[in-house]
Structures are given as structure tokens and as C-alpha cells.
Curated annotation (Swiss-Prot):
Taxonomic lineage: Bacteria, Pseudomonadati, Thermodesulfobacteriota, Desulfovibrionia, Desulfovibrionales
Organism for this UniProt entry: Solidesulfovibrio magneticus (strain ATCC 700980 / DSM 13731 / RS-1) (Desulfovibrio magneticus)
Pathways involved: Amino-acid biosynthesis; L-arginine biosynthesis; N(2)-acetyl-L-ornithine from L-glutamate: step 2/4
Keyword DNA repair: no
Top EC class, one word: transferase
Main location group: cytoplasm
Protein name: Acetylglutamate kinase
Length: 297
């Protein structure tokens, strides 16, 4: 089979997947190494543009932790973390918003547009896209009294303005969302990007939620990739201590999304070129899919 015939064969192999996703929404959380490596940045942009051109509606939510950390260091503002979340005082919040909304967001928008897409950058403040409230975190330690952890201006999502997103999608745009929210009094909050992506996917009734990470997916106790997890199995993996560290909030976010009606959630290695296409348009995929069998019954 020559190269041209092989290419035609590959396109035909993708047809069932394209048909399945046509007209559907896919929410992608963009973060990790894929945001800082130029080759991976280009691969990401082209994957997103391809989705749009074949009739799928991609919505991007991005992080920016390393970029925020570098700017805070440059400004001699000390970074503090509690339970894996950045403590965000007023000065830090100003930097977070400046970096996420003014720099990272616009860089992503510019890259997609340069590669032939039509992206529009948004923060949660635009059209009250993301409404939020202060995150209240309580840490329980055995018989000790519960400890209330004050993270400052770290928020949790209370609402998503889906009309704004669907209006942009209907006009052919690719929304790119910075995870900054606002409460009813106008206070600004720093929100975990995975959490925002999950909330956006659930609110939109998206077909898929995709989280890009710096690992191959969810690993078992032997460090072997788990290709598929039901939410019950995921809960058990947490209880058994199989899931640790930063993977816990990612899996929790996916579980909440599929429980709310998203068909599947995926955790992928963003360091792999074309990881989005490989996961969505091949039978085996390359990462971990999280499903709710009960919800689909």
C-alpha cells in the first residue's frame, strides 16, 4: 500500500469516530508540559483546529501554574501552598489574574488563530462566565479537631454562563477560558483549572472532558496504565490509596463530570504529540477514560 492509499485508509478509519462526535462539545483542560514545549503547543493547536473543522465544538480551559510561579518570583512574592492549592492573598490574586488572563490566555488564542483557527479569549469575569464563592476547606485528622484552612482568594464554581459559550460556538469560535471567577459582590477568585473544566463540561452537557497532564494517565499500584475506570472503581482506588497526590483532584473532577452527564472523561499525557486525536479517534486510546456505567444504563 503506497502512502496515498494508506492516508485514505486512515481517514476512513476515523469516519465512525467523526460521525460519533459530529456536532458535539468536547471540553479540554490544557496544562502541564504541553503548554511550555513549542512543538507540543503547535500540536495542541492543530488538534483543536482539526476538531473544529470536522464539526466538533472544542472548548479550552487552561492552567498556568508555572507561569504564575515565575512571575511571583520575579516580583519577590513568596508562593505558599496548602493541600496542593496556591494560597492567594490580594497581591497574589493580582498576579494570577494578570498572568492567566493577560498573558497565558492571549498566547493560546494567538497560537490557535495563527494556525488557522478562530479563538476568543475569556476569563470568568467576561459576561459573568464563571461565578464563584470562596472555597472553604476543612482538614480532618483522626481524633483531632477539624482544621479550617484559609486559602485566601481561592474559589469554587457556583455557576457557568453557558449561553455565552454556546453563542461563541454557534458563530464558529473556539472559546479559550482562564480559570478566574467572580462572586456576586465582584470579588475575584483563583480556581483550579481542572475543576473549572469539569464544571464547564457538566454545564454544557459536553460529550467528553479531556484533561492533559504530565503522566500517561491513571496508574495502578504497579505503575501500569489503567485504560478504563468506572466511577465506583475510581472511588475504591482512592480509598485503597492507589491514587495519590495531584491525581486525586483530577480523578474527582472527572467523576463529578461523568456523574453529571458527561459521557466520558479522559486523563491524557499532554507530552505526547497529537494526544487528543489519538485518544478520541482510535479504539485503544492512549490514556485513561473514566465512565459512569450506572449513568449510561
Amino acid at each position: 500500500m503506497n502512502r496515498e492509499h494508506a492516508k485514505a485508509h486512515l481517514l476512513l478509519e476515523a469516519l465512525p469516530y467523526i460521525r460519533n462526535f459530529y456536532g458535539q462539545t468536547v471540553v479540554i483542560k490544557y496544562g502541564g508540559h504541553a503548554m511550555v514545549d513549542e512543538q507540543l503547543q503547535e500540536s495542541f493547536a492543530l488538534n483543536v483546529i482539526l476538531l473544529k473543522y470536522i464539526g466538533i465544538n472544542p472548548v479550552i480551559v487552561h492552567g498556568g501554574g508555572p507561569q504564575i510561579g515565575r512571575m511571583l518570583k520575579l516580583l519577590n512574592i513568596e508562593s505558599q501552598f496548602k493541600q496542593g492549592l496556591r494560597v492567594t492573598d490580594d497581591a497574589t490574586m493580582d498576579v494570577v489574574e494578570m498572568v492567566l488572563v493577560g498573558k497565558v490566555n492571549k498566547n493560546i488564542v494567538n497560537l490557535i488563530n495563527l494556525k488557522g483557527g478562530s479563538a476568543v479569549g475569556l476569563s470568568g469575569k467576561d459576561g459573568r462566565l464563571i461565578t464563584a464563592r470562596k472555597l472553604e476547606m476543612v482538614l480532618e485528622r483522626g481524633d483531632a479537631p477539624p482544621e479550617i484552612i484559609d486559602l485566601g482568594k481561592v474559589g469554587e464554581v457556583t455557576g457557568i454562563n453557558t449561553q455565552l459559550i454556546t453563542t461563541l460556538l454557534a458563530q464558529g469560535f473556539i472559546p479559550v477560558i482562564a480559570p478566574v471567577g467572580v462572586d456576586e459582590d465582584g470579588e475575584t477568585y483563583n480556581i483550579n483549572a481542572d475543576t473549572v473544566a469539569g464544571a464547564v463540561a457538566a454545564a454544557l452537557g459536553a460529550k467528553r472532558l479531556v484533561l492533559l497532564t504530565d503522566v500517561s494517565g491513571v496508574l495502578d499500584k504497579d505503575k501500569t496504565l489503567i485504560s478504563s475506570l468506572d466511577i465506583k472503581e475510581a472511588s475504591q482506588a482512592m480509598a485503597d490509596g492507589v491514587l495519590v497526590g495531584g491525581m486525586i483532584p483530577k480523578v474527582s473532577c472527572c467523576m463529578e463530570a461523568v456523574d453529571a452527564g458527561v459521557e466520558k472523561a479522559h486523563i491524557l499525557d499532554g507530552r505526547v504529540e497529537n494526544c487528543i486525536i489519538l485518544e478520541l479517534f482510535t479504539r485503544s486510546g492512549i490514556g485513561t477514560e473514566i465512565v459512569c456505567k450506572r449513568c449510561q444504563a
